[in-house]
């Protein structure tokens, strides 16, 4: 049906879009950063700490509205784009 064809068309557009985005891996450097952070920030969530670890290992900036948690991590660059 035309609805099914439209769905596949939209799916293909989504795949094309996501292929243009660079994925950041949780590699050995990120894992080492994560282990340090995990011991320093026991109250922060594992996923947030993994995101922070990847960013620190790549010297990257985290775009987030969660400045309360991410802001606790020294040397982590964060930006909040939601307030503009």
Predicted segments, located by residue:
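Acidic, PIN/NYN-like endoribonuclease modules and their adjacent C-terminal/linker elements
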Residues: 52, 56-84
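PIN-domain endoribonuclease scaffold, especially VapC-family toxins
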Residues: 1-53, 83-84
